[in-house]
Amino acid sequence: MAAAAGRLLWSSVARHASAISRSISASTVLRPVASRRTCLTDILWSASAQGKSAFSTSSSFHTPAVTQHAPYFKGTAVVNGEFKELSLDDFKGKYLVLFFYPLDFTFVCPTEIVAFSDKANEFHDVNCEVVAVSVDSHFSHLAWINTPRKNGGLGHMNITLLSDITKQISRDYGVLLESAGIALRGLFIIDPNGVVKHLSVNDLPVGRSVEETLRLVKAFQFVETHGEVCPANWTPESPTIKPSPTASKEYFEKVHQ
C-alpha cells in the first residue's frame, strides 16, 4: 500500500513538473531572449504562490538546524571581479552570513545583494563575512556584476557571489525548490566554529532586511562576550538581561517603571 501511494505521489509530481517544463519551453520559443528569464520567474512564482506539491523543497531530506554545524560547501565564487575556489573552511574564526537567492538578472535579488554589499564594511567591523549564493554559474555572476545598477545589474561588489550550479549547496541547506531548480531566500548566520546561530527562509517574492541581519550578528556576539541575553528589539545601545531569576529583575525594573 505504501509503495503504491509513493508511486502515485511521484507520478503526480512528475506530471506537474512536466507541465511546467512544457509551459516554459513554449514561452521561450515565442518570446525573445531578453524576456525568457521574466517568463520563467513569473511561472515559478505563480506556482509557488498556489502551494503546488511539485514545488517541494529538499528540507525533508536534510535541514540544517540552529546549534548544529553548518553543512560543508565548496564552489567557485566571484571575489573582487576574479574567480576563486571557496569553501566553508575559509571562514573559520569568523562569522558568516550565507544567503541564498533564486536567480541572477531578476528583480528582488539585486536589491538584496546591493544592500548587503553597501553594508559590507559594517559586517567586516564585527568580524563577519557575507556570501550570496544562487544556482547560476560564476560566469553569470560576473556578467551581472559587470552590468550597471541602473540596468538591473550589481555593479562593483564588496561581497562574494558563490556559484551553486550543481544545486548541491542549496539542497544541503534545505532551501532548494527541487522541481523548479532554484533556491528560496534562505539566510544562515554561522559562527566562527561553523555552528548555525540563525536561519530564516523567505518565499520568492519578498526580500530580507540587511539591518536586521547585522543586528542579529551583533546580538549573538554580545551574548558570547558578556554572558547576558538580548531581549526583543535589542540594539547595541539598549540594556540586556542577566539570565537568572534574581539578577534579571534589574532589567525588568528598568524597562517597566
From Swiss-Prot:
Q: How is it modified after translation?
A: Phosphorylated by LRRK2; phosphorylation reduces perodixase activity. The enzyme can be inactivated by further oxidation of the cysteine sulfenic acid (C(P)-SOH) to sulphinic acid (C(P)-SO2H) and sulphonic acid (C(P)-SO3H) instead of its condensation to a disulfide bond.
**Listed GO molecular functions?**
cysteine-type endopeptidase inhibitor activity involved in apoptotic process; identical protein binding; protein kinase binding; thioredoxin peroxidase activity
Residues forming the catalytic site: 109
Enzyme category, top tier: oxidoreductase
What EC designation does it have? Answer: 1.11.1.24
What this chain does, per the entry, is described as:
Thiol-specific peroxidase that catalyzes the reduction of hydrogen peroxide and organic hydroperoxides to water and alcohols, respectively. Plays a role in cell protection against oxidative stress by detoxifying peroxides. Acts synergistically with MAP3K13 to regulate the activation of NF-kappa-B in the cytosol. Required for the maintenance of physical strength.
* Residue positions where N6-succinyllysine is found in the record: 84, 92
Where in the sequence is the transit peptide found? 1-62
The effect of disrupting this gene, in the record's words, is: Accelerates decline of physical strength; at the age of 10 months, the physical strength is much lower than in the wild-type littermate. Increased oxidative damage and decreased mitochondrial DNA copy number in skeletal muscles. Increased apoptotic cells in the brain.
**Residue span, Thioredoxin domain:** 64-222
What GO terms in the biological process aspect are recorded for it?
cellular response to reactive oxygen species; hydrogen peroxide catabolic process; maternal placenta development; mitochondrion organization; myeloid cell differentiation; negative regulation of apoptotic process; positive regulation of cell population proliferation; regulation of mitochondrial membrane potential
The protein's UniProt keywords, in alphabetical order, are:
Acetylation, Antioxidant, Cytoplasm, Disulfide bond, Endosome, Lipoprotein, Mitochondrion, Oxidoreductase, Palmitate, Peroxidase, Phosphoprotein, Redox-active center, Transit peptide
Which gene is this protein's source? Answer: Prdx3
Family per UniProt?
Answer: Belongs to the peroxiredoxin family. AhpC/Prx1 subfamily.
Q: What is this protein called?
A: Thioredoxin-dependent peroxide reductase, mitochondrial
Tissue specificity here reads: Housekeeping-type gene preferentially expressed in murine erythroleukemia (MEL) cells.
> Where does the record say this protein resides?
Mitochondrion; Cytoplasm; Early endosome
